[in-house]
UniProtKB/Swiss-Prot annotation:
Matching SUPFAM superfamilies: Chorismate synthase, AroC
Superkingdom per UniProt: Archaea
Similarity comment text for this entry: Belongs to the chorismate synthase family.
Protein name: Chorismate synthase
Annotated GO biological process: amino acid biosynthetic process; aromatic amino acid family biosynthetic process; chorismate biosynthetic process
CDD domains: Chorismate_synthase
Disulfide topology: none
GO MF term (any one): FMN binding
GO cellular component: cytosol
Native species: Thermoplasma acidophilum (strain ATCC 25905 / DSM 1728 / JCM 9062 / NBRC 15155 / AMRC-C165)
Length: 360
């Protein structure tokens, strides 16, 4: 439900228009000095209102850590992270109480929770709930970086604009496409879509470097299963593929297999079509996966819906502040959430000790 993880667990709480959102981390290694500036940097990458290309709901997204630290170091008790909601306008959502938005979870929440559903701003199924994912995941990401493990995500495509090259840092570009030409084209597309009152989707690629081999379990607890389980908690994510994914279905075995080789006395593979995972277990090569993020369902174009009280067809035009391309703000969410999963897997496998350190 609201808890993720095995040896290290994260529980999220709050809702889009509640007092706050947050996360509780239980099982994080003891004695780690949390780099608060680093955490806040990733919150800024995700923060709404930071660009004309994102939702204009302006939030500070400052993370408060109210437990789990002693003199700046993790002390073994649960870390509690809180992000206050300060820019809430619930009146925008009065219409969707009876008229569910097409493509949104309004209707399925009605089926499950009935009159008790939290519909304002999407409630606890809002994209706002990715803020605590970034807060918790960025701490895990900082820990992994201390081990030399790098987790990087970027926009591979937005609509029909595809970026097949990486020529810069994704966060240096407004669209998170790591190339100046692609960034400019994608920005123009988003502005055009936004002017029309519509939205557009995108694809996010992720690469994990320097992750050790031999991590993961076969069958139901494979590395792919663990990552996918977490990634699908991000609203609007509808697909994931590892390595070459669906392209493998049209390849020959002689093409899809990754031949083994030696490099500096270490076994490596010449290619990486399988994305660094075989049999659910990492092989020491970079972990690669891609996700598809659908267009934001809240758009300013009139759409047909059905009134839940009268059972009559009607039309809804969504009000409020919404992302024309929500995939852009999902990039740091994917990075941080992946980092949390990978650190949990490393703790499970014994690659990470419960103690980051016992002395300062």
């Amino acid at each position: 439900m609201f808890t993720l993880g095995s040896s290290m667990k994260m529980t999220v709480f709050g809702s889009s228009h509640g007092e706050a959102v947050g996360s509780i981390i239980d099982g994080f290694p003891i004695g780690f000095k949390i780099p608060l500036d680093y955490v806040q940097k990733y919150m800024e990458y995700r923060r709404p209102g930071s660009s004309i290309l994102t939702s204009q709901r302006k939030e500070d997204d400052e993370v408060e850590i109210i437990s789990g630290l002693h003199e700046g170091y993790t002390d073994g008790s649960p870390l509690t992270l809180i992000i206050r909601n300060k820019n809430v306008i619930s009146s925008y959502y009065s219409e969707i109480r009876e008229n569910p938005r097409p493509g949104h979870s309004d209707y399925t929440m009605f089926l499950k929770y009935g009159e008790f559903r939290n519909y304002e701003g999407g409630g606890f199924l809002s994209g706002r709930m990715t803020a605590p994912l970034v807060a918790a995941g960025s701490i895990a990401k900082a820990y992994l970086e201390g081990m030399g493990i790098k987790v990087k995500s970027y926009m591979r495509s937005i609509g029909d604009v595809e970026c097949s090259r990486v020529s810069g840092e994704a966060y240096s570009f407004e669209t998170r496409m790591p190339d100046p030409e692609c960034d400019a084209r994608a920005r123009e597309l988003i502005m055009r879509v936004m002017k029309a009152g519509d939205s557009i989707g995108g694809r996010i690629d992720t690469v994990v470097e320097n992750f050790p081999g031999g991590v993961g379990e076969p069958f139901f607890d494979s590395v792919e299963s663990s990552i996918a389980h977490a990634i699908f908690s991000i609203p609007a994510v509808k697909a994931i593929e590892f390595g070459d994914g669906f392209r493998l279905a049209s390849m020959l075995g002689s093409e899809a297999n990754d031949p083994f080789d030696l490099a500096d006395g270490k076994i490596v593979t010449k290619t990486n079509h399988n994305g660094g995972i075989l049999g659910g277990i990492t092989n020491g090569m970079p972990i690669r996966f891609s996700i598809a993020v659908k267009p934001t369902p809240s758009i300013h174009i009139p759409q047909q819906t059905v009134n839940l009280s009268t059972s009559e067809k009607t039309t809804i035009t969504v009000k409020g502040r919404h992302d024309p391309c929500v995939a852009i703000r999902a990039v740091p969410v994917v990075e941080c959430l992946t980092s949390f999963v990978l650190l949990d897997l490393l703790i499970q496998s014994g690659n990470v000790n419960r103690y980051a350190r016992k002395t300062r």
